[in-house]
Amino acid sequence: MNSILKNSVMAFALMFTSLGAFAGVQVGVSSDNYFRGHNISDGVGYHVFASHNLDNGLWGGVKLMSMDGDADHFMASMIGYDYNLSDKIEIGVGYADYSFQGGDGDGWNEMMMSVSYDGLGSLRYRKGLDDAGDMWSFSTGLLKYVDLSYGDWDDGGSYFQISKSWDMMGGSVKVGYIDHEDNDDDFADKLTDFDNFFVGYSYNF
């Protein structure tokens, strides 16, 4: 079953690549690359993200992030389907394949489910396949001036992030603070530790 889903993801990505149908390509650089609360670049990192949304609700995308450690890059390939229940409510399902490029790390696969309410936020649940852990997360811009997100991953612990984005030079600048449960520093030390803060710039083509 997993091999069928993997092949579907790759076929979807190859189809769009061959047709030149990617509607959006984003490139970015950040003081640190974070994935689910974990700093995977241990310093300046970059990412490339290509995606496409079809008119019938189907979508697909591939994201590549630089990393430091046992691999050169971390890649996420995803396909999914979104459906609007109303003007405010959207539900979605999808499949994701995560892999490590240039190293020996083992990847994993997930089924994804989400519900979003316009003006309130999004709740996402990811079911790990085989022996992979599950994850749920919530994100919201309800605080008006900043975005807030929280996630809890069986294989990686819990984290929260607060961030703010601005349009600049044709792209977007994002600054934020992220804290993971593995960080044992007291609150005062966390606020003075620059490792907990990040700044990045991304540009969409």
Report residues per predicted region.
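Outer-membrane beta-barrel proteins
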Residues: N2-F12, S18-F205
